[in-house]
Amino acid sequence: NTRSKDYSELRRKPRPGHADFPARVKYHNMHDVAGGGHFSGRLTAPLCIAGGIALQALEARGIKVMAHVAQIGGISDLPMDDMVYREADRKAIQTNDLPCIDAAAAGRMREEILAARDELDSIGGIVECGIYGLPTGIGDPMFDGIENRIAQIAFGIPAVKGVEFGMGFAVAAMRGSENNDPYRIDAETGEIEVESNNAGGILGGIST
């Protein structure tokens, strides 16, 4: 987008899958089309910077965050443990060509991406993220819950089209008794904990 003229045609020929047309209507054709303007994925760069700072602040409080590419097209990575933080997974994610737990899956995903590129196309994917060590009681009900806050930020990334917490939409095929996360007392610490994590560690907008 260093050459604005490369994007001048977009005022007359909006691209499918981009915000060119709705932005044209909303801003009466006065928006910046160079590089996608303020709808560009380039603007996620400052989010990465803010995220890097936040990760350090959270780690200082014993809270760990880990994410990986869970799926590209029809190729899936090994799942993260949704209850226990595994340092081996983090090291694998940081080491592989793509941030995946399984090196073989990362290789196949890379081939899938390159194949789409060679056909002048693209391919979709899923990112899985886990937060470990978050204290119980963080968040608020209704419109200020943890899900609300996370979703609001996640949808700031232009390509994001869906967010799930815990079992997500798979709950539609489950009974309530299956989806519940029963409580138990840890024999060693005496603390209350859950046996499963179907709710994604959030109930009523508050961390469990």
Short names for language-model regions:
Residues 1-22:
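Glycine-rich, N-terminal phosphate-binding loop and its surrounding beta-alpha-beta segment
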Residues 2-3, 73, 135, 189:
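Residues that cap or initiate secondary-structure elements
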Residues 4-7, 78, 138-140, 163:
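Short helix/loop capping segments that flank catalytic or ligand/cofactor-binding pockets
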Residues 8-9, 67-69, 190-194:
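Short, well-ordered strand-loop elements centered on a beta-strand within folded domains, enriched
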Residues 15-22, 110-117, 171, 175-176:
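Short secondary-structure transition/capping segments
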Residues 16, 20, 25-28, 178, ...:
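Residue-level signal for pocket-adjacent positions within structured domains
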Residues 26-142:
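Glycine-rich, mobile lid/loop segments that gate access to catalytic sites or pores
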Residues 48, 119-208:
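Glycine-rich anion/phosphate-binding loop at the beta-strand->alpha-helix junction
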